[in-house]
């Protein structure tokens, strides 16, 4: 922090940090700027240990879904998906194969803090296929060749929502592991949506089905 430890907003943060055994280090604004990579940094920066879920502890949840991402490469997409996962109450995110780092600066910024609220796990494709083989509920994947409209699928849990790589989509093995393959209608000249947008649209359809809007 930049020396404003007496600030009314900062004081409770410092008290909580002290209770949990953390350390507070005062530093100059110029050093904060160098660490954050921003010309006008916030007056407080935090450093936290990365949290990863043990893949062996990924369990079905009837009321919430897991999001599985196949080789997602764009940190902005991943950060936005983490934010949407948190907003829709998803259980967590499974990163399959060679994915971008969810703890990179770009991903953390795009998540707007949601990186600390969702469970994250990573595994190779073969391990995910083993998980999928024993999954007791639906695995819904999005794919351009699919013929079923995403709005006509029952997203009852336990659910895995499987999303493909930004350029290549899902691998053939992952598509085969899905219980349903869905598409989104494209009414204009574009043939697909951005990965983060497509994930958000599908998550909110699943949320709408689980929690339909009240009358009035």
Predicted regions and their residues:
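N-terminal positively charged helical leader segments and presequences
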Residues: 1-37
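Short beta->alpha connector loops at strand-helix junctions that form conserved
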Residues: 2-3, 27-28, 70, 96-97, ...
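Short amphipathic alpha-helix with an adjacent loop that forms part of the alpha/beta core around
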Residues: 57-60, 127-135, 151-154
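Histidine/lysine/aspartate-rich catalytic loop segments that bind and position anionic ligands
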Residues: 91-134, 138
